[in-house]
Amino acid sequence: MRIAYILTSLGIGGAEKQVLALADRMSARGHTVLLLALRARQQQEWPAQVDVVYLNMQKTPVDLVAGALRARRALGAFKPDVVHSHTYPANMLARMMGLCGAAPRVISTIHNVYEGGRLRMLTYRWTDLLVCHTTAVSTAAAERFIRLKAVPREKCGVLTNGIDTGEFTPDTPRREAMRTQLGAGNDFIWLAAGRITEAKDYPNLIRAFEQVQDTMHETQLWIAGETAAGSRSSDREEPGCFRLKASSSEHDRVRLLGLRRDMPTLLDAADGFVLSSAWEGMPLVIGEAMSMEKPVVATDVGGVRELLGDTGSIVRAKDSAALAAAMLEAMRRPAAGRAMAGRAARQRILRYFSIDSKAAEWEKLYQSLL
């Protein structure tokens, strides 16, 4: 098959990483693959192993039209059998390409429970005739879009994210080296990861960690993620006061690590992973932590429950006391018990969420449309 993937950018993010992993797997399975990125090439990107066309679509009307024309030319030359788009901007462009005949079969994928307000939901509904199928990365996301009438139930399915279990495999020497580099000592290290945005609700995590510190002092919190430019904030403290708190003497055990490309190594070095999000789709990093055999404490958002099953702790969103209690419970568990739970988590990923099994599912869906 000839498969074209359309995504907003190749920037460092979970959805982008998932699309690139899928593109690589499809290429390895003998298909011809092309990537179209709406934005221009960025300074920080995931590396692509397949051909990429950058559409350079900025927010001005001229740039948007020029980018759409570039997309039409690229798809016209490539002649795809299937066009698979990811997240709202790319989904709308793919549908436009279907309207003009450049995309014979379009699949749209929704990567979050929340992809915008009422107008976006209406545009999903109005353009649904231009797609063959819509998928969501979690049941929670699919049900919300169906409930809002953005997608009809008969054309919507769930196909979860996949984890590269080869990349995310525990490695003891790597763990020790990173712990030494970052000054972990004998502390229990909690790792959180993701852009510093409203959705991730880091103020909730900081409040929870304060409570953990009141009880167990020999612990650190590492946060890997960049500030997303132009992100909304529901809390006046985010991200400015959050940075101030993290750098103050009161919170000298909170480390802001910035943008990182070495998540397998960071997860190796950590003793547990914590997610404090207010909303999510299907957080890839939780699956990665499970693949690394780490205990996971997470808020009950998006597809978290689908991923974790009974292998981790799930608490209410925006409840720092519950989050702290679950973190403390994980820390108090004997090391042997944590190790056993970690192995069970990895087995769950291997059985249900490996990227290779997901690639096979996608391939089957593509073939069903031909």
Q: PLM ranges: what are they?
A:
Residues 234-258:
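Nucleotide-activated donor-binding/catalytic signature segment of Leloir-type glycosyltransferases, i.e.
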Residues 16-21, 188-211, 221, 321:
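A conserved mid-protein helix/loop that constitutes part of the nucleotide-sugar donor-binding site
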Residues 259, 278:
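Aromatic "clamp/platform" in nucleotide-sugar-dependent glycosyltransferases that forms part
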Residues 169-184, 238-242, 336:
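A short helix/loop element that forms part of the nucleotide-sugar donor recognition site in Leloir-type
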Residues 107-137, 143, 149:
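A conserved, positively charged/aromatic
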Residues 5-66, 229:
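N-terminal strand-loop element at the rim of the active site
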Residues 36, 286, 295-298:
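Short hydrophobic beta-strand element within catalytic cores of glycosyltransferases
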Residues 310-320, 329-335:
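Conserved acidic donor-binding segment of nucleotide-sugar-dependent glycosyltransferases
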